[in-house]
């Protein structure tokens, strides 16, 4: 693939993941939520609470500042709290959790392969991020000195749409000044990979789970997209 000039990456579950293991359980979540009470609640009820809050945040397509992001996540945790009255979350605690989600740049941790591969690839290609996320994601990259490796960072809430809308990929290509056949895209979602394929970008479906990787590798036979188990696998294709 000698004509490749740019590599586009999803962020979450590709380059980094939540330090707590859950996107909306923030690093200081247990400072404000009684863990014993939380763990005594049926998991189905907890899933429902997060799902209701998630339904709300997904309606907020355009979030261009961290200030508005905070407003939205205060509402998010209010909805979450209303579904779980057992937690007895006060308005102050709700505000503190939301603040932790928006203003704590240590909420995500970068994967080992990302820490190794990204600096290497940045020497050979233009790199871009195409992520369904909010403005605070930029702080995570800045805190980890990772913005230096990327020529473009496209965040869905800032442009008002999300993957697999073609606007996400086309905006990234335009920012990097490359054509679709000069770029590749890596995501942990097949749907998003297929969205990239629709605009002519070769995609790589990242499956970090070994069993899922093996299964999806077999299913990908004859398909345009490729399946990889690690970012290290990119080296044999680029």
What is the meaning of each model-derived region?
Residues 54-68, 105-112, 167, 202:
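Short amphipathic alpha-helical segments at helix boundaries and their inter-helical linkers
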Residues 52-98:
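A metal-dependent, Asp-based hydrolase signature
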Residues 24, 28-32, 45, 52, ...:
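Alpha-helical elements of Rossmann-like donor-binding domains used by nucleotide-donor carbohydrate transfer enzymes
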Residues 131:
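Conserved phosphate-coupling serine/threonine residues in phosphotransfer and NTP-handling enzymes
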């Amino acid at each position: 693939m000698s004509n490749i000039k740019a590599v586009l990456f999803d962020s979450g579950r590709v380059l980094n993941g939540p330090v707590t293991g859950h996107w909306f359980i923030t690093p200081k979540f247990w400072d404000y939520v009684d863990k014993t009470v939380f763990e005594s609640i049926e998991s189905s009820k907890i899933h429902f609470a997060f799902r209701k809050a998630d339904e709300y945040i997904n309606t907020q397509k355009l979030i261009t500042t961290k200030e508005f992001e905070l407003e939205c996540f205060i509402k998010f945790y209010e909805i979450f709290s209303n579904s779980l009255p057992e937690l007895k979350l006060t308005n102050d605690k709700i505000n503190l959790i939301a603040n932790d989600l928006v203003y704590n740049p240590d909420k995500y941790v970068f994967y080992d392969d990302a820490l190794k591969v990204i600096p290497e690839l940045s020497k050979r290609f233009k790199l871009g991020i195409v992520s369904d996320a909010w403005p605070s994601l930029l702080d995570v990259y800045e805190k980890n000195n990772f913005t230096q490796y990327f020529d473009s960072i496209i965040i869905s809430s800032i442009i008002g749409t999300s993957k697999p809308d073609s606007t996400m990929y086309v905006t990234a290509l335009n920012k990097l000044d490359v054509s679709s056949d000069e770029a590749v895209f890596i995501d942990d979602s097949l749907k998003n990979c297929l969205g990239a394929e629709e605009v002519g970008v070769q995609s790589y479906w990242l499956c970090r789970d070994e069993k899922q990787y093996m299964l999806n590798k077999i299913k990908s036979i004859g398909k345009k997209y490729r399946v990889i188990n690690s970012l290290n696998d990119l080296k044999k294709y680029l």
